[in-house]
Amino acid sequence: PVRSIFRKRRDVNVFMEQVQEIDVKNKRVLLSGRSPVDYDYLIIGLGMVNAYFGNNHWAKHSIGLKSLEEARKIRRKVLHAYERAEASDDPQERRRLMTSVVIGGGPTGVEMAGAISELTRRVFKNDFRSINPEESRVVLVEAADRILGTYSVESSNSALKNLEKLGVEVALNSPVKDVRAGEVELGDQTVKAESIIWTAGVEANPVLKTLPAEFDRQGRICVEADTSLPGYPEVFVIGDIANLTDIKGQKVPGVSPAAIQMGKHAAKIIKKELKANQSAPIESRNPFKYLDKGTMATIGRSKAVAEVAGMKFSGFIAWVLWLAVHLIFLVGFRNRAAVLLQWAYAYIGYRPGARVFDLPTSEVDILENERLQRAES
């Protein structure tokens, strides 16, 4: 809802374009579908993209979760797999279609595995006649010895127990050897699955490589204490693409609360300098200080883990905290009210989420050709 947020600000323009290059020397941003945009100040928050540790061919056989379109692909993939399983007479093919593999045991992977298991085992429970959704298989793959590695051991163990209660198979100490069409090869087994979801690795947006900057191993930009690009004080880099140790000596994590705080910090600097009608030396700018408001991950219905101000929560209380935080960060009262009502309906009726999906054009063409062939015969 970016346009609606700024609908009363006639001095704000919104462009839905792809950034091709950032020319900091000429203070210009090159876009894919329109003329370049010149700037006086620039805030870069392009975010991360999926990384496959040098195995880029894995991207063809798995779906990441870094964009809305990828989220839609996951929904389409899972729902269509069960429709195909319902129509199949082959038990092994049914088993494969009803198996989902989530690679990566971080917060995103844990939440995804729990959501798919609840959807397929409980929501689908009475929807099909030829298959039994309770026989669904969800495998969460993690190379380390525990999931939620950045959380405490207590929270990690709690999340593991809750996932197992939901029927999720958690494969620890299981680095991925290969991802092929319809299967994932681990150290000691090969899992055949229709839905393969990648949440294991990220790297900085490749557009950043056009910048004259120092990068870390993940491609993040090493920034100044005020989040500006070294040598270019009018350019700020925020969010998970910034490699920054704050004034307190703590590494700023690549999470949304940190990105929001960094954005506000950069905006205050810009506002102050515009008001003074001059740029200030970096040394006189206030350094960024990260306020850790805690971490949390939802696992399923009434199940979550949270660590806030040194306190650890799990179960229903942590789940309510997770809901509250996500409501707070929504824009506008109407959006908050609508989401709250949707959540309440889903919780009471156990009918979460929209289950309408469309097929990719290629699959639609295949089905149409099959229909025409049957008609001709």
Residue ranges and their predicted role:
Residues 32, 45-46, 174, 199-200, ...:
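Short, well-ordered coil/turn residues at beta-beta hairpins
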Residues 103-106:
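Glycine-rich Rossmann-fold phosphate-binding loop(s) that bind the pyrophosphate
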